Amino acid sequence: MTDKPGIVITGASGRMGQMLIKTVLDSDKAELAGVVEREGHDWVGQDIGIAMGGAALGVVVTDDAGSAFAGAQAVIDFTAPQATIAFSKLAAEAGCVHVIGTTGMSEAEIAQLDPAAQDTVLVRAGNMSLGVNLLVQLTKKVAAALDEDFDIEVIEAHHHHKVDAPSGTALMLGEAAAEGRGVALAEVSDRGRDGITGARKKGDIGFSAIRGGDIVGEHDVLFAAAGERIVLRHMATDRAIFARGALKAALWGQGKDAGAYDMIDVLGL
């Protein structure tokens, strides 16, 4: 037995799933308690080490999330919205900290996480890296300092496998800019321009998405006025930064009161 928190990774076969597994295995502060994949996946029933092309680790991939969560201390979840909602209920029942990096969730889907946060620690963020969360804070401060003579645009780039746009990080940055200006993002968001769109509406916050190659993640927040521009930028070159941040959140959540938290809370920013 060990006093290290046991971590379950969902979506084990995905890019982030495998990176999370490696991060937990490399950590001296946590242990891998379980791995989950969807029903019917080729990995189900295999030892995760062998499934990932290495030596056996004694942890078998399961499609029974409830059983995997039982006895674990945290779940790290980078999957899909409906899966995350289901996992949130199971994590709450098991008393596991639930760290959510799933993106592409609608406001209605996010609201479905609220009941779980009444019973356990739920940490959700569109991006788990320290650098991006610092960028969020900077964006809020710059937006608050500048008036609407500065147009705000959020430009993001990701690999060609990414299925949602704008990215969760781009939306975090847009929310920060809107908060800095004291407005609701939903009222000023401009997510698509094509054809004869007319002049840019003053006060809008625009979004542009690029998809190509193996780009891990790049985000620019542009403040553009007549005669000058300010650009705040973050470039991720290794998705390990997201895995390290997620593990940090899982460890931070141990012993905390039930509730909904984000990486700003985890990092104390």
UniProtKB/Swiss-Prot annotation:
<dbReference type="GO" id="GO:0009089">
    <property type="term" value="P:lysine biosynthetic process via diaminopimelate"/>
</dbReference>
<keyword id="KW-0521">NADP</keyword>
<keyword id="KW-0028">Amino-acid biosynthesis</keyword>
<dbReference type="GO" id="GO:0051287">
    <property type="term" value="F:NAD binding"/>
</dbReference>
<feature type="active site" description="Proton donor">
    <location>
        <position position="162"/>
    </location>
</feature>
<keyword id="KW-0560">Oxidoreductase</keyword>
<comment type="similarity">
    <text>Belongs to the DapB family.</text>
</comment>
<comment type="function">
    <text>Catalyzes the conversion of 4-hydroxy-tetrahydrodipicolinate (HTPA) to tetrahydrodipicolinate.</text>
</comment>
<keyword id="KW-0963">Cytoplasm</keyword>
<dbReference type="InterPro" id="IPR036291">
    <property type="entry name" value="NAD(P)-bd_dom_sf"/>
</dbReference>
<feature type="binding site">
    <location>
        <begin position="11"/>
        <end position="16"/>
    </location>
    <ligand>
        <name>NAD(+)</name>
    </ligand>
</feature>
<dbReference type="GO" id="GO:0005829">
    <property type="term" value="C:cytosol"/>
</dbReference>
<dbReference type="GO" id="GO:0019877">
    <property type="term" value="P:diaminopimelate biosynthetic process"/>
</dbReference>
<feature type="binding site">
    <location>
        <begin position="168"/>
        <end position="169"/>
    </location>
    <ligand>
        <name>(S)-2,3,4,5-tetrahydrodipicolinate</name>
    </ligand>
</feature>
<dbReference type="GO" id="GO:0008839">
    <property type="term" value="F:4-hydroxy-tetrahydrodipicolinate reductase"/>
</dbReference>
<dbReference type="InterPro" id="IPR023940">
    <property type="entry name" value="DHDPR_bac"/>
</dbReference>
<dbReference type="GO" id="GO:0016726">
    <property type="term" value="F:oxidoreductase activity, acting on CH or CH2 groups, NAD or NADP as acceptor"/>
</dbReference>
<feature type="binding site">
    <location>
        <position position="37"/>
    </location>
    <ligand>
        <name>NAD(+)</name>
    </ligand>
</feature>
<feature type="binding site">
    <location>
        <position position="38"/>
    </location>
    <ligand>
        <name>NADP(+)</name>
    </ligand>
</feature>
<dbReference type="InterPro" id="IPR000846">
    <property type="entry name" value="DapB_N"/>
</dbReference>
<dbReference type="GO" id="GO:0050661">
    <property type="term" value="F:NADP binding"/>
</dbReference>
<comment type="pathway">
    <text>Amino-acid biosynthesis; L-lysine biosynthesis via DAP pathway; (S)-tetrahydrodipicolinate from L-aspartate: step 4/4.</text>
</comment>
<keyword id="KW-0220">Diaminopimelate biosynthesis</keyword>
<dbReference type="Pfam" id="PF01113">
    <property type="entry name" value="DapB_N"/>
</dbReference>
<dbReference type="InterPro" id="IPR022663">
    <property type="entry name" value="DapB_C"/>
</dbReference>
<feature type="binding site">
    <location>
        <position position="159"/>
    </location>
    <ligand>
        <name>(S)-2,3,4,5-tetrahydrodipicolinate</name>
    </ligand>
</feature>
<protein>
    <recommendedName>
        <fullName>4-hydroxy-tetrahydrodipicolinate reductase</fullName>
        <ecNumber>1.17.1.8</ecNumber>
    </recommendedName>
</protein>
<dbReference type="InterPro" id="IPR022664">
    <property type="entry name" value="DapB_N_CS"/>
</dbReference>
<feature type="binding site">
    <location>
        <begin position="125"/>
        <end position="128"/>
    </location>
    <ligand>
        <name>NAD(+)</name>
    </ligand>
</feature>
<feature type="binding site">
    <location>
        <begin position="101"/>
        <end position="103"/>
    </location>
    <ligand>
        <name>NAD(+)</name>
    </ligand>
</feature>
<keyword id="KW-0520">NAD</keyword>
<dbReference type="Pfam" id="PF05173">
    <property type="entry name" value="DapB_C"/>
</dbReference>
<keyword id="KW-0457">Lysine biosynthesis</keyword>
<feature type="active site" description="Proton donor/acceptor">
    <location>
        <position position="158"/>
    </location>
</feature>
